[in-house]
From Swiss-Prot:
Alphabetic keyword roster: Cell cycle, Cell division, Centromere, Chromosome, Kinetochore, Mitosis
Name recorded for this polypeptide: Protein zwilch homolog
Family: Belongs to the ZWILCH family.
Taxonomic source organism: Xenopus laevis
Complex and partners: Component of the RZZ complex composed of kntc1/rod, zw10 and zwilch.
Length: 597
């Protein structure tokens, strides 16, 4: 029996070592098959969500699980059409993580532990023990305790020598809304004391609240693709489900995706969206023109703009500008009824920017763009208009306007991609100035901080990407301002964090921005709500001798490889509200240590 155990331990050690080397060399990301029905993943800490609350912070770890079954069968559909022809359909089951029996999982951890024991010289032929990343095994809750994870991690000395092994056992019960079934904090402390013979213990609390889910605000910017949660951490837990004290350390987690119809900056998003259509068309040669809501054609709108400029030259009073200004105010008011818009319409639009505003809402074809620019260039050549433009504008049209001041204009061939590029350029110029006006106007950034994002010295496609980053930053700040009513003292560091991230990383709307915040600032959003996650850690010992017992409640299933029977929930029972109940999954993580010497 011992020989068989030793052989199994060596086999597992060799397999895990081989897998780790392949991952380090980036030869494969797995999963790696071990035996017929077992596979292993190598993941970075934080990339396996079900383990986020249980891991100790290792950079890399193994996850061992049962190989999932994939079914792909041809199924005869008995239904026949009018001609009597049978149809065949193919069904493929999406693989889900699979657990192994708890007893077998313990055997794998035994093998893993044996190979790390420096006293087992017969397993390593006298060679130094090779330290492997921690091993976690998915369990099927088949034991009486309901074990869903088993983990093992080597304990190393300051000289990087293995001195023992740390084990973690994660148990989980099915969902319940009956708080009377929860253990008391005293009983958890007593169990920890008896398990670890500890006389001195400290407690640390953690709670996470969903700030979008716990309140309903009419016409707010709440959107399912976006989320704002807050994490609280505090010492000295007093009871189970304790409300985080105001002295807690709190951190906002903000993930925002653009395109929410209720966002105060939705009109800006639509403008950016058209800019992206042009950029894609310039790159591929194919443009997917959006539908226009204008009753007048693009050429008619541009002609009206030119006539307005001519009338100004002739000293006539313009009615067009008044109507446009009224429409701008009306549009701004329509964006948001109950939340004051964070961004205001600029009043210093130059000719190129006004041209962009009309063309982006009305052009529906390549020929529209050509015809509009033909009108403008002809009016400039004939000296019919003398429009003003902002200093520093870098678009081709701005350069033509500057040349028209001196009566000498270069000829422009409105063929190929030239008209598309000209339109994209004036759109980029306009939107850059919009974002500058917003961030500097709200005293959230200086021009020097924004210079990277508005630079015209890079390729035009890169300019578009940087403008996308500016818009995402604006969406993040607006959500916190409009929905959470955060003031400048919080919006300023949030903006700086966004600027720093996007100077170093590509555009990514899945990124979660974090902002430390005083609990009192957001207390009205969570104090009458239920936490998504609530956790208490009971800790004793120090350094490598530290042991911890964790007891946690989550509103979502804590593991993805075990199914739980969901209890019948009354119709009026929801997950938020002052006097409403919530269904929780209780989970406990126990720790133990074994010394090798």
């Amino acid at each position: 029996m011992w020989a068989e155990r030793h052989r199994a331990a060596v086999e597992l050690q060799q397999f895990l070592s081989s897998v780790y080397e392949q991952v380090k060399k980036e030869e494969s990301l797995g999963p790696f098959q071990f035996k017929d029905d077992i596979q292993v993943h190598v993941v970075c800490d934080g990339h396996c969500k079900p383990l986020e609350s249980f891991c100790s912070g290792s950079e890399v770890l193994y996850i061992l699980e049962k190989k999932p079954l994939t079914l792909e069968d041809n199924v005869l559909d008995e239904t026949e059409n009018n001609e009597g022809i049978s149809f065949y359909t193919s069904l493929q089951e999406i693989p889900q993580p699979q657990a192994i029996p708890t007893m077998r999982a313990r055997q794998f951890l035994t093998s893993y532990t044996l190979t790390h024991n420096p006293n087992m010289v017969q397993l390593n032929s006298g060679a130094p023990v090779k330290v492997l990343p921690p091993l976690w095994v998915r369990c099927d809750c088949s034991d009486a305790e309901g074990t869903c994870w088993l983990g093992a991690e080597p304990i190393k000395s300051s000289r990087n020598e293995i001195t023992g092994m740390s084990f973690r056992t994660v148990t989980c019960a099915g969902p319940t809304a009956d708080k009377s079934t929860f253990p008391s904090l005293d009983s958890l402390r007593q169990a920890h004391k008896e398990r670890h013979y500890s006389s001195v213990m400290q407690t640390r609390g953690f709670a996470q609240y969903d700030l979008f889910g716990c309140n309903t605000v009419e016409n707010s910017v709440i959107e399912s693709q976006s989320s704002v949660t807050v994490d609280f951490v505090w010492n000295g837990v007093e009871r189970i489900l304790q409300l985080p004290p105001l002295a807690s350390a709190a951190t906002l987690n903000i993930k925002v995706e653009s395109g929410d119809l209720r966002s105060p900056v939705y009109s800006v998003y639509k403008e950016l969206d058209f800019l992206l259509v042009l950029a894609e068309g310039l790159k591929t040669g194919v443009t997917e023109w959006p539908e226009t809501g204008e009753t007048k054609s693009a050429v008619d709108l541009v002609q009206l703009l030119l006539n307005d400029l001519k009338n100004k030259v002739d000293g006539l009073t313009s009615s067009v500008s008044k109507k446009d200004n009224e429409k701008i105010k009306s549009d701004t008011a329509a964006v948001d009824c109950s939340i004051q818009s964070f961004i205001t319409e600029r009043g210093d639009l130059d000719f190129a920017e006004m041209l962009w505003c009309r063309m982006r809402k009305s052009v529906s074809s390549y020929q529209d763009v050509v015809n509009c620019f033909s009108l403008v260039i002809q009016s400039l050549k004939n000296g019919e208009v003398h429009p003003w433009i902002h200093r520093g504008s870098s678009s081709a049209l701005s350069k033509l306007i500057q040349q028209s001041y001196h009566g000498k204009m270069q000829s422009v061939s409105l063929t190929g991609l030239t008209p598309m590029r000209m339109l994209l350029e004036i759109g980029l110029d306009k939107m850059k100035k919009d974002y500058i006006s917003c961030f500097i106007g709200q005293d959230l950034a200086t021009f020097n901080y924004l210079d990277y994002f508005i630079s015209s010295s890079v390729d035009i496609q890169e300019q578009v990407q940087r403008v996308k980053k500016l818009h995402h930053m604006l969406e993040v700040v607006v959500v916190c301002n409009a929905f959470l009513s955060l003031g400048h003292e919080n919006l300023f560091p949030l903006t700086q964090s966004c600027l720093k991230y996007y100077k170093e990383n590509p555009w990514n709307e899945q990124h979660v921005f974090q902002l430390p915040i005083r609990p009192s600032v957001i207390s009205t959003f969570y104090q009458n709500s239920h936490p998504q996650t609530w956790r208490v850690e009971i800790i004793s010992g120090h350094g490598q001798k530290e042991v911890k017992t964790t007891w946690q409640l989550t509103s979502r299933r804590p593991v993805d490889h075990v199914s739980f029977a969901v209890p019948d929930v009354p119709i009026d029972m929801t997950i938020s509200g002052e006097n409403e109940e919530i269904v929780y999954y209780p989970t406990q993580v126990s720790c133990s240590q074994v010394n090798f010497c």
